């Protein structure tokens, strides 16, 4: 991946756990010949100079500023407040928090141990209660203080212990926080809970873990449903699949939770997949836009959902690259997009040419591809 990060910002641009290829450990890969090291250094310096020119406004536009066709707010219509209150754990960039907010829930608090992620939520929702850093460490919280004040607990515990990207050590991984999520639910006893994670956690390898850590302790108090959902089936132009656990308290006199049905058809965008959704044929559902169409880019004759966007919360690289594997890099190239150095704005991206001439993404573009409302 010669110099593909373009010497970009050292801030996060992605928002989720990887599918593969990002659990980096050790420094063995850094032992490279001096000649190649010098070549990388020259590429990096040239990229930084080009970036400086783009950020200063001195560089000319290499393309028009794109105007997205997809408005993600239309995928999650804003609903009236109904009085139910939601507490967020492992909040990250606030995706679940925003979803529950738009669904009419009153935000109680967000807990996120990484300061910069908590700062992101605060910047976008300054009126919310956000606990970051030490305050966001869920292992140190007595959740009984929230009993009677929270109706739903939701969160996505760190996925690295279960992702195919890593060693999949499960409960032996210090980052396994599912027991803390379960502790929170049992101490607060909300009316309902929702947890999500990578599909790897639903694999046979982790069946005993899921049963002993999630289903049995929560099943004492809740009717629990496990199911999977794919983002493109709900109009999001990104290849993202997640497993969910949703529970409704047994004494709540509420109907059993029913997973949502797909709202969009994406058969026309699934030619690269091993299994094809909606394989019964055409449906009456609206079609999910491909990534190019969603971002308002010219029709090249080929479009597809974007590959799973890499989280910059994983691994030691701290770059604005959102590519998570060589296979994903090829898929980005197929749709003419450059994922290795996300620009801070569309204006800057329009002045900062990618090495291969492909469309350089901006933070706002990545938000659209992930379904984040503006």
Per-region residue spans from a language model:
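C-terminal target-recognition/interaction regions appended to catalytic cores
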Residues: 2-43, 50-55, 72, 286-374
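Core alpha/beta nucleotide-donor-binding catalytic domains of modification enzymes
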Residues: 40-43, 47-192, 199-212, 216
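Class I S-adenosyl-L-methionine
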Residues: 141-152, 160-335
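Residue-level signal for pocket-adjacent positions within structured domains
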Residues: 133, 157, 196, 224, ...
């Amino acid at each position: 991946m010669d110099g593909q990060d373009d010497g970009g910002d050292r801030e996060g641009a992605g928002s989720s756990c990887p599918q593969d290829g990002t659990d980096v450990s050790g420094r063995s890969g850094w032992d490279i010949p001096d000649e190649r090291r010098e070549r990388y250094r020259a590429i990096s310096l040239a990229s930084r100079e080009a970036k400086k020119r783009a950020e200063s406004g001195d560089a000319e536009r290499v393309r028009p500023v794109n105007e997205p066709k997809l408005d993600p707010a239309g995928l999650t219509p804003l609903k009236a407040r109904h009085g139910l209150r939601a507490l967020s754990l492992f909040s990250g960039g606030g995706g679940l928090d925003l979803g529950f907010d738009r669904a009419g829930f009153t935000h109680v608090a967000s807990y996120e141990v990484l300061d910069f992620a908590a700062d992101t939520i605060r910047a976008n929702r300054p009126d919310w209660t956000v606990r970051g850093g030490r305050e966001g460490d869920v292992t140190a919280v007595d959740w009984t203080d929230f009993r009677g004040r929270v109706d739903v607990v939701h969160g996505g515990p760190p996925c690295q212990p279960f992702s195919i990207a890593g060693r999949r050590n499960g409960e032996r991984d210090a980052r396994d926080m599912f027991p803390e999520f379960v502790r929170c639910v049992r101490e607060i006893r909300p009316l309902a809970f929702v947890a999500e994670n990578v599909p790897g956690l639903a694999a046979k390898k982790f069946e005993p873990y899921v049963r002993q850590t999630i289903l049995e302790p929560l099943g004492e108090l809740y009717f629990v449903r496990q199911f999977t959902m794919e983002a493109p089936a709900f109009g999001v132009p990104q290849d993202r699949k997640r497993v969910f656990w949703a529970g409704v308290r047994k004494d709540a006199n509420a109907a059993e939770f029913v997973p949502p049905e797909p709202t969009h058809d994406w058969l026309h965008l699934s030619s690269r997949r091993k299994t094809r959704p909606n394989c019964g044929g055409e449906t009456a559902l609206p079609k999910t836009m491909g990534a190019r169409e969603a971002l308002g880019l010219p029709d090249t004759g080929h479009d597809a959902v974007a590959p799973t966007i890499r989280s910059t919360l994983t691994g030691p690289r701290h770059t604005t690259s959102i590519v998570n594997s060589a296979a994903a890099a090829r898929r980005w190239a197929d749709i003419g997009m450059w994922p290795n150095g996300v620009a801070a704005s569309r204006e800057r991206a329009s002045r900062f040419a990618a090495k291969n001439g492909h469309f350089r993404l901006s933070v706002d573009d990545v938000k659209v591809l992930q379904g984040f409302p503006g």
